[in-house]
């Protein structure tokens, strides 16, 4: 049985479409490889940015801990300063010639208790179970912050020597000034680190969203369209082949 020219033309039409679909599929495969190559590089950069951002974020958390240490130390020094003021008052009273020995003894007893209270304030000032009046190193966003807060000696304090109290109060003032400067420096570091973290995350999102996600989604959409066309062509070709086979029987 002869196959009509129209049938042959229809067969060639579907075969040509199938071939074109196959060629397009190959082009898309090459495109996938190209996209994968680019996005692999972008992923590596994005991973690096994510790691950098995580490191910065942890540094910021460490910096906040450092500020917490300094704030607790400053609060303790505020109480100690008040105690030192009271010692200074007692020292002035001790110079009152009208006081008898019993009254002076009472002043010395109060001074001793205040001195013990000052020592307790130094010893009991803790952050997360650690005494804040020591040297601590904190790895923060831009390096290492060191808090060097050594407790002041109180052995030389005496209400019989106002100079000893004045000297102690001067040391307290210097220590509190260092704490204030430290808090300001760490706060500035935190602000810069947070901005760096935001920039890193924005760069990471741009890499993933603009390159990988968009390109891959575009490819997938086109690839599905081509596969659908190829599938239709293949199905039509199979139907033609079936008809030809039936005609040849």
From Swiss-Prot:
GO terms for molecular function: structural molecule activity. InterPro entries: Flagellin, Flagellin_N. It is found in: Secreted; Host cell surface. Disruption phenotype: No visible effect on flagellar structure, cell shape or motility. Adheres to host epithelial cells (human HEp2) but invades less well (14% suriving bacteria, determined by bacterial counts from lysed cells after 2 hours of gentamicin treatment). The secreted form is about 1 kDa larger than the whole cell lysate form, presumably due to post-translational modification. A 22 kDa form is also found in the secreted fraction, probably resulting from proteolysis. One of its GO terms (cellular component) is bacterial-type flagellum. Keywords: Secreted, Virulence. Pfam families: Flagellin_N. It comes from the Bacteria. Its main location: secreted. Plays a role in virulence. PANTHER family: FLAGELLIN (PTHR42792:SF2). This is Secreted flagellin C. It comes from Campylobacter jejuni subsp. jejuni serotype O:2 (strain ATCC 700819 / NCTC 11168). The lineage of its organism: Bacteria, Pseudomonadati, Campylobacterota, Epsilonproteobacteria, Campylobacterales. The gene is flaC.
